[in-house]
Design a protein with these regions (language model features):
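DPxDG-like acidic metal-binding loop motif
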Residues: 55-62
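Conserved beta-strand elements of the Class I
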Residues: 19-20, 110
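Residues that form or flank phosphate/diphosphate-binding pockets in enzymes
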Residues: 16, 56, 92
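A non-catalytic alpha/beta surface segment that caps or lines the substrate-entry region
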Residues: 1-15
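Histidine/acidic-residue-rich, glycine-tolerant segments that coordinate divalent metal ions
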Residues: 5-7, 28-30, 35-46, 52-53, ...
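Active-site-proximal helix-loop elements at catalytic-domain edges
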Residues: 13-18, 115
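Generic beta-sheet signal
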Residues: 18-19, 79
Length: 196
């Protein structure tokens, strides 16, 4: 299932009900410098954001469910394990899964994500969406440059970029109902080529 994704079906082959359990699995393009024994051995890749926990939890659930697979089948129930790749990249591995048809016949999906705000042994539940979906936008500002000693002779795009970064979220917060759940976060910003 894609380059690293995996789908595992347990229980009934023609179920009356199919439940999917989803966990993200891929490493992130982050250099790990913790020095811990379990640190990534691959330079520039590590299991941050809980992905190692998510993959381990889903694998553990799969092992436990495999032990009762016959009982699930007798009850006409199936469980589909979705080891989802590329959660953090756009457009993301979920879209590949959906396009491949892995959601066909699935009645309910439970996803897992660790949350450091919860105490060990606690779980948090919510019906419906829990976190934001992401879209990626690229904004390019073009104009006449110049020297910092004469900003009045330039379009001063660095200043304009600062206004875009601060004003777009502010304007949207006044134009969109806050219950709609819209958030704008700029992940990377760059401006200019010279210090002056």
């Amino acid at each position: 299932m894609s380059e690293t994704g995996l789908v595992v079906d347990l229980g009934a082959s023609e179920p009356r009900r199919r439940v999917a359990l989803r966990g993200d699995i891929d490493a992130l393009p982050v250099r790990e410098r913790t020095g811990l024994d379990w640190s990534s051995t691959v330079d520039g890749a590590c299991h941050a954001c809980g992905h190692d926990v998510h993959a381990t939890a889903l694998l553990g659930a799969g092992l436990a469910l495999a032990e009762v697979a016959d009982e699930l089948a007798a009850r006409h129930v199936a469980v589909r394990l979705l080891f989802q790749p590329a959660e953090e990249q756009m457009p993301g591995g979920a879209l590949k899964f959906v396009k491949a048809g892995v959601m066909q016949g699935v009645d309910t999906v439970y996803a897992v994500h660790c949350d450091p705000s919860l105490d060990v042994g606690e779980i948090g539940l919510r019906e419906g969406p829990l976190t934001a979906a992401a879209d990626q936008v690229t904004v390019t500002l073009r104009g006449r440059g110049g020297h910092t000693s004469r900003p009045f002779l330039t379009e001063d795009l660095t200043y304009a970029l600062g206004k875009v970064v601060t004003d777009v979220p502010a304007v949207l917060s006044r134009r969109v109902d806050p219950r709609a759940g819209l958030v704008v976060v700029w992940g990377r910003v760059s401006a200019g080529e010279a210090i002056n």
